[in-house]
Structures are given as C-alpha cells and as structure tokens.
C-alpha cells in the first residue's frame, strides 16, 4: 500500500472517529437560573404563601357559553370521510348538542373541587396545583410525587388515577402524596408575561413548587409535555428527584435517529419482533408524522394567531382539542365517523378538559410552550444529550405517538430500571388506562426504592473500609 493510501485511510479513520465523538458526546448540565422572573414588569417581593383556591366560574361565563353553543354553523363533511380531515362535523354537532343541553358544569365543578386546590407565586407567576394527602396508618409510607400533564390535557386527566395511587394496597407498603400542577399558561396557572418559558424553564418552576410545599426529595411522573418537563427536572435536580416515571420516554438526537436508520437493516433485532411495527417501515411512520403534525408547526411558530379563533369559538376549541384525543388514543380511529371517542371516554369527561381551557381562556397561552421549547435558545440547551442519572422507568403504550427502544433511550437515561410494553392504550394514559398506569408506577417506584437502598448500603460499606 502506498503512503498516499495509508494517509488517506488514516484520515478517514480519524474523521470517522471525530464524527462519532461529535454525534455521541454528552453535554454538561446547563446553568438554568432558579429565580428568573416570568411575571409582568421587574422582579419584586412576592407572597410565598400557599393559598387555598376553589374553582368557581362566574354565571356570566357559562351563560355566554350557552349562547355561543346555540349559534354554531357546521360545514358538512365530505362523503366517505370520517376523521381523516379532522373532527367530523356530524359528530361535532352531537357533541355541541350534548354540551348545550346535558352537560352540567356546576356538577363537574363540585367534582373537581373534591380535592384541595391551591395557588402560590413562583418566580412571578401564580401556579395552581391540586394537593392530595392520603389518610393511612403509620406502617404505610407516604411518598411525594408530582404528576405533570401536557397539551391538550390538564390536571383533570389525573382524577381517575388519584384513588389508585393514594389508597393502601396489600402488595406495597407505600402510597403517594400527589401534587398535580397546572403548567404555567394552562388552566388556572398564570401565563408568562415574557418570552422564553420553555419546558426546561418550567421544570425549574415545578422544582421550586415542590420545594415551596416542603418536599426536598420527591418522585416525578409525566406524559406529553409533562414528560419533557419531569425529564428536565430529573436532569437538572438529580439530588432531589428520587425517581422518574414517564409514559412518553423520548429523545430526538442525531445518534438515536441514525440507530433507527441502521436498525431498518435488521428491524426485528433492533426493535424486537413485537415492536417492529412501531418504528418500521420508516417511510410510513414519517408520512404519518407529517400528516398528524400540522398543529405542531402552527403552535411552534404562530400560536397567537390560531389562538384568537379557538378562544372565541367553544365549538372550534372542542374540535381542535378532541380531535387529538381521538387520533392520539389510536391513529386508526381516523377511519371512524365518531372518531371512536366514546369507546374509551365519555362526552362528559372530554368536556371537563375542554372546559378548563374555555373558562380560563388559556388556549393561546397553553400553545406557546411549543414556540418557546422549539426556539433556538431552548434547543441550544441540548437537553436530550445531557445525561440523566436519576432512576427511570418508561411505560410504553402501544398506540403512543412515538416509540424509542431501550437501546436508544439509554443514551440519555443512564439508570433505566424498568421498561414496560403495555398491552393497550395510547397517548392519554392517565385518562384512558389509569389502572395500567398506576400499576406501572407502583412497580417502578419499588425498583427506585430498592436501587437507592442498594446504593446506600454500598456507600456505607465503602465508608466502613
């Protein structure tokens, strides 16, 4: 081999090595200020008390809603089209009629007020949360856990799972004390007055909330945007987060995407026989993503424009939100005239969530999380490439919008203790399959406890040497 060839091969090897390093290198934990002021004007002294709060919507708001629901015109759907073009207006008419004539907000309001609600000011924003303290005997351990919702959800998604997580069981010696916040700009939580409040900055607010309540160490759980927020909490505050459970474990790195491409050569080996269809063929999943992500592009670029229409029209708001509850639960439901919405949910349950957006006028501010979290400033934090050492568990529901193998997730989550392939369910797990989700949370937290116990024992042994 000539010297030129040797030099060329050496250059190629070095180049590939540098490329591999750049693609796979881990980033340091970013320095996110803990006291950024997100309220109006300049930072000022705040009331740090935790104020009891009760949902009590003005009659005028409800009367206006009824008037608007009585004056809706519907464009007929195309022949042979179900939910493929979005929310079928024949189904929407039935929903609006139910909303106007049968849905009773005052009854639902009383149900929502069943658990104690509070507000407290964090970094200039009044943050709303529900706080559930279980009543148990002394031999049952009570573990604090924050559960964070996403879009287009709200804290009401968790109401079914509350008793499952707070009631003592014979197979575990612990239950959970739950903190269910509304993300800033959602529902009864105040929206930021300044740009820049992305998922990572919200994670700081949620950590400060837990600290304000009195929890120095706690567990986290989330799906959708909640999954991104609690993942960031685990990454930024490993000394405080005891365990991280998510029903949407996801990362979007160049190296993980390359693995998906290379894995297409050996799909069953890469994904496992039962999970191949969740990733491959790549082209099919790409076009599905393209078809279903139109809302994402709007909300990541011009959320305030579409927000004007959605805030003004309750029927439009319901269609926009509940179309996601159909497709997000099972994308095959696009081929059903009613979107199969009532096969897993009731109209009442679905409208409870829509009402949180309507009565608070928060649809515009809720959508801004997309623009803030996909800004260049936020993306430059490279949170997906900052390692998370906190014990982690992933519940993988079969109809979730995205799927990553444990091999890919291990890039970020260095202590992945549990990964469960669920038998059924989709994106809105807490509302759709609360029992499955609760079982997985209990199982995961038991593993987290055992992990910390072994770690503490090992540290003690090292100290004794």
Swiss-Prot record:
Q: Which residues cross the membrane?
A: 7-27
Query: What is the membrane topology here?
Result: Single-pass membrane protein
Name of the protein described by the UniProt record? Juvenile hormone epoxide hydrolase 2
The protein's matches in Pfam families, at most eight in alphabetical order, are given as: EHN
Q: Where does this polypeptide localize?
A: Microsome membrane; Endoplasmic reticulum membrane
The record's comment on protein family reads: Belongs to the peptidase S33 family.
Q: What does this protein do?
A: Catalyzes juvenile hormone hydrolysis.
Q: Kindly identify the residues recorded as the active site.
A: 224 (nucleophile), 370 (proton donor), 427 (proton acceptor)
Q: Which residue spans adopt a coiled-coil conformation according to this UniProt entry?
A: none
A Gene Ontology molecular function term for this protein is:
cis-stilbene-oxide hydrolase activity
Q: Which SUPFAM superfamilies match?
A: alpha/beta-Hydrolases (SSF53474)
- The organism's lineage? Eukaryota, Metazoa, Ecdysozoa, Arthropoda, Hexapoda
Q: Name one GO biological process term.
A: epoxide metabolic process
Q: Which reaction does it catalyse?
A: cis-stilbene oxide + H2O = (1R,2R)-hydrobenzoin; 1-(4-methoxyphenyl)-N-methyl-N-[(3-methyloxetan-3-yl)methyl]methanamine + H2O = 2-{[(4-methoxybenzyl)(methyl)amino]methyl}-2-methylpropane-1,3-diol
Instruction: For this UniProt record, give its keywords in alphabetical order, as a comma-separated list.
Output: Aromatic hydrocarbons catabolism, Endoplasmic reticulum, Hydrolase, Membrane, Microsome, Transmembrane, Transmembrane helix
| GO terms under cellular component | endoplasmic reticulum membrane
- Source organism: Ctenocephalides felis (Cat flea)
Q: Where does it primarily localize?
A: membrane
The gene it comes from is EH2
The EC code for this enzyme is: 3.3.2.9
